[in-house]
A protein has these predicted regions:
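Gly/Ser-rich oxyanion-binding loop with an adjacent helix/lid
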Residues: 1-51, 84-89, 95-213, 370-373, ...
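Short, conserved glycine- and acidic-residue-centered signature motifs
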Residues: 55, 99, 329
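Short, flexible active-site loop motifs that bind/organize anionic cofactors or intermediates
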Residues: 131, 295, 360
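FabD-like malonyl-/acyl-CoA
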Residues: 138-139, 360-365
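C-terminal nucleotide
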Residues: 1-36, 61, 65-96, 193-351, ...
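Structural signature of FAD isoalloxazine-binding scaffolds in flavoprotein oxidoreductases
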Residues: 50-69, 188
Length: 401
């Protein structure tokens, strides 16, 4: 479907006209960008590793109308309307960490293709939970990018190229470090395997697969702690992995030979500490698990996929250590994982999801247990904490209505 359903369009039109006035007979552009779930490859993307991700049935949906001004005005349902001027597309230090920085960053990227930026009004809703590890920011970036691409008459942008633009925007304009997986999953759509060793041209493959057809539901559970608050903890993961790589004169772990790492471990431990070494161990182990899980999914072997997913979850907890930020009495992610394991009772699989340190956990739940699982997790963690998601086949796009 390349047009919004009737209810979504009515909501968007109401929001737009409340903020910007009647649309009248002006041409309307519809924009859609899904959220994503990391299916496998926990913190491997920023080291040039492998990932499997899927776009989800939650999304940024918006409508845009061109104007004669040099301003982009944005109405985001539930948040104050804001605007930026197009006088300069340079990084604004005062905007870092704000929604305006994403607009300016994507405008800079699209304008760099050789097109003239023009003003427009954009109203959108977002059903992607914020701070829950489903990449709401990547969906917003992709939505802005597709809107600008179409409104400004830019050449067609390939999904991975748009993802790279979005990543640069988040890194440089918003000021948050991130790999390419979030943006690539949002832009590609469906279930996708990604190899990030070649940063300029990542390799991607896609697979049509519905977990429900294999007897399992993809359930994400909000743990009750927003991972946005753990930016420093998140940033320490790639920093420590890359500290290890730097000891070999490299920038990412994908460039380091594992045998060389093994030979130098005592020296690395003495200089960088245990955690950096453990995180490097996780990278290579998890990277191998990604490839094995992709092979299992392609073979339709869901049981093997689940065995490997449980191994991945253990590696994240023990070696990557992105479940608990600081040991203490409050450990919401570990608490949620324990409760999920308790309900699953050896069936399915559960793991930390995405960046970690809060946000969400991911569970593959047998279909006959889904209602019980969601009811119990909601009872323990709060109504609406657990939700059953489906893989969506559409990546970010824009279409004239």
């Amino acid at each position: 479907m390349t047009t919004p359903d009737e209810k979504t369009f009515a909501t968007l039109t109401k929001l737009f006209e409340e903020e910007f006035g009647p649309i009248g007979d002006r041409q309307v552009l519809y924009v859609h960008a899904p959220g994503r779930s990391e299916i496998s490859g926990n913190h491997t993307d920023h080291e040039g590793g492998h990932v499997i991700a899927g776009s989800l049935d939650v999304a940024v949906d918006g409508i845009a109308v061109a104007t004669d001004s040099n301003k982009i005005r944005v109405a985001d349902e539930g948040y104050p309307t804001f605007e930026i001027t197009l006088d300069t597309l340079d990084i604004q230090e005062s905007e870092k960490g704000t929604s305006a920085s994403l607009v300016r960053g994507m405008a800079h990227e699209i304008a760099a293709l050789g097109v003239e930026p023009h003003g427009f009004d954009f109203a959108f809703t977002c059903s992607v939970p914020s701070g829950g590890g489903l990449s709401s920011s990547a969906a917003v970036e992709a939505a802005y990018g597709r809107a600008m691409e179409t409104l400004w008459g830019a050449p067609a942008i390939e999904p991975v190229t748009l993802a790279q633009m979005s990543q640069r925007t988040e890194n440089n304009y918003y000021g948050k470090p991130c790999g390419l997986m979030d943006q690539a999953a949002v832009c590609l759509g469906g279930l996708a395997y990604m190899d990030f060793e070649d940063q300029a041209q990542p390799k991607t493959q896609k697979l049509e697969l519905n977990f429900e057809d294999h007897g399992y539901a993809l359930v994400l559970v909000k743990v009750g702690a927003d991972h946005v608050a753990a930016t420093d903890d998140y940033a320490a993961v790639p920093r420590e992995m890359q500290d290890v790589a730097a000891e070999f004169g490299k920038t990412r772990l994908c460039e380091v030979n594992v045998a060389d790492f093994d030979a130098k471990l005592p020296e690395l431990r003495a200089k960088l500490g245990d955690r950096a070494c453990l995180r490097a161990v996780h990278y290579w182990y998890e990277n191998g698990l990604v490839d094995k899980r992709w092979a299992a999914l392609n073979a339709g072997d869901i049981d093997q996929f689940l065995v490997l997913t449980r191994e991945s979850g253990a590696s994240s907890a023990m070696y990557l250590q992105n479940v608990v930020a600081k040991l203490g009495s409050q450990q919401p992610s570990m608490y949620a994982l324990a409760l999920a394991e308790h309900v699953l009772d050896g069936r399915g699989a559960v793991r930390i999801h995405g960046g970690g340190f809060g946000g969400t956990i991911q569970a593959f739940v047998p279909l006959d247990l889904v209602d019980t699982f969601i009811t119990k997790m909601n009872g323990w963690l709060g109504e609406g904490s657990a939700r059953h998601y489906a893989i969506s086949d559409k990546g970010a796009y824009a279409a004239w209505l």
